[in-house]
Amino acid sequence: MTRTATLLSGILVCFASCAAPDSEPAMEEEAAPMLNTLTDEERAEGWTLLFDGKSLDQWRGFRSQETPEGWEINDDSIHYTGKVRAGDILTREQYGDFDLRLEWKVLEAGNSGIFFRASEEYESLWYTGPEMQVLDDAGHRDGARRETSAGANYALHPPSKDVVRKAGEWNQVGIVAHGNHVEHWMNGEKIVEYELRSEDWKKRVAASKFKDLPHYGLMDKGHIVLQDHSDPVWFRNIKIRKLD
C-alpha cells in the first residue's frame, strides 16, 4: 500500500468514527392513523363514511329498521359477535356505481362476506347481491378452493393473487362497481375483475349454486351488506364514493 493510500484510509476511518454519534437520537414514533375518519382531500373527492366508530346509525337488519342483536361496536369496529344468529346488516342507502373501501379481520377459521347491489325484494340478500368473500384461508375449508377463498367473487371468480393476511390481522379491501364492470382489491392489489351480464358471467352463474336465481348480480342499485356467517368478524374504516 502506498503512503497516499494509507493516509486516505486513515482519514476515512476517522471520518466514519467522528461522524457517527455514540447513540442515535430517539426517533419520534409516527402517530397511529386515525380510524373511521376522512381527510379533507377525501371529502373533497366525494367520499363519505359508512361507520364513524361511534354508532351503527347507517346500518340496519334485513327488512327491519333496527340493528339486530349480535352486531355491536367493538375495538373501533363494527363487530359481529358470533354468539347469536343475528342476520346480515345492510346500509340504509342504496348504491349503484361506487368505490367502496374498508378493512376486515376474522379469527381462525372465520367466514363472512361483503355483498353489494343487494335487494330486499327477495327471500335473502344473497339472492341478488354478488359477494366478496371474507375468510381465513388457512383455517377454513373454503380456503382450499380458489373460487371460495378470501377476496373471491364468491363461487364464481377466484382471486388472481394470494394476498390475504393471517387470522387476526387486518385486510384492506375495496370493491369498485361501475356499470357492469366490477373489481375486487385486497391489500393494495387488484385480485378479481369481471363483467356482469357478460357471456362469461352467464356461463359461470349457470354452472353455480346461483343458477336458479334469475336476478343474481343483475340489480342496477342495491345495499352494501355485511354478512352474518356465524363467525366473529370485525369491519372498520368503511367509506364509499358514488361514481354515478
Residue ranges and their predicted role:
Residues 1-4:
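Positively charged n-region of N-terminal signal peptides that target proteins for export
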Residues 6-16:
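Bacterial N-terminal signal peptides
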Residues 18-244:
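Carbohydrate-interacting regions of secretory-pathway proteins
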